[in-house]
Amino acid sequence: QGITKETSPHVAEAIRQTKGQILMDGEEICDARFSKCCGGITEEFQYCWEDTPKTYLTAVRDIALGVEHTLPNLTNEEEAEKWIRFNPPAFCNTQDKKILSEVLNDYDQETVNFYRWKETLSQEKLQQLIADKLKMDLGAILDMKAVERGKSGRISKLQIIGTEKTFTIGKELEIRRTLSDSHLLSSAFVVDKYDKDEQGVPQRFELIGAGWGHGVGLCQIGAAVMGEQGYHYDAILLHYYQGAEIKKLYK
């Protein structure tokens, strides 16, 4: 967010206290990915980028440390739909304006509906987006189905079924770019179809979604809530980058 916004006595003190400390995976510096809101469970690296899993970028339930929990299998479509339509507790499940103002730019604060959200696309708009983004004519769109989901419920392969052609897109960034003029909040969504015509073609699609961004690594809003609740920076880092270590490499 730039030096102007981030430079403050608090930031300067945080830099001083953590000088020389590096987040490590064995002898290698961690690839410390982050996104705005994981949606309750962080995503694994390989579902968003190269098929090379990283041991410290795995699925993590974003809830209080030490609380017993199970990690739902969100690669399963039935489990993913149940999770996305539900509003489970999580660090990043917050509408606290003070915390959000510390994490988000002004224009990003226009909505607090990012942990769970809805996006409506008309048949006409969906066809237009597909033509613009994919340079394809699939005909009228009949359905969109998840072919593969990651551990956070984010779709990594999406099948778009048209009257003329069926096409599969992925990974998550291509899906988000295709279904929005800019970027869909995330690819963790389920699709409801409405207003079918006489040919059975839906005239309206409602995407019910979870989270904001790719969801891999540190969840910015979750981390801000953890900080507000008194968690130390090392506990926050090791919550999101499980299996990593913080090492002092220089003074």
Locations of regions flagged by a protein language model:
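Conserved, single-site charged/polar hotspot
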Residues: 1-251
